[in-house]
Amino acid sequence: EQAKALFHKMKDKILDKFQELEFKQRKKYAGFYSKRDGSAICTIEATKSKLKLIYSTSKKDLIPKSNFVQDVSKIGHWGIGNYRSEIKNDNDIEQAIPLIGKVYSDKIS
């Protein structure tokens, strides 16, 4: 239930902030894609208690590694991208939105 509520909050927040994105449900994850060219911006994998948000970029300087962001390029994972944040609460959602914005800005430029 917690992850489901977080998922809906995250989905709504992303779609409200970035109107040029569309949501697509895949078998193992959900994704947000550019309406213009179909490129992935981020994907979300839900577990029982948290969300795994994958930023759809391989650019090391775009999403800085931190306690909130880990490099998963050498770890098996669902989703598209090399950087992941675990979303466990509303504060994590707020922290992730600017990072999604960086990927979005990079993809549309």
Question: Which ranges hold each PLM region?
Answer:
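Solvent-exposed, charged helical/coil patches
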Residues: 1-10
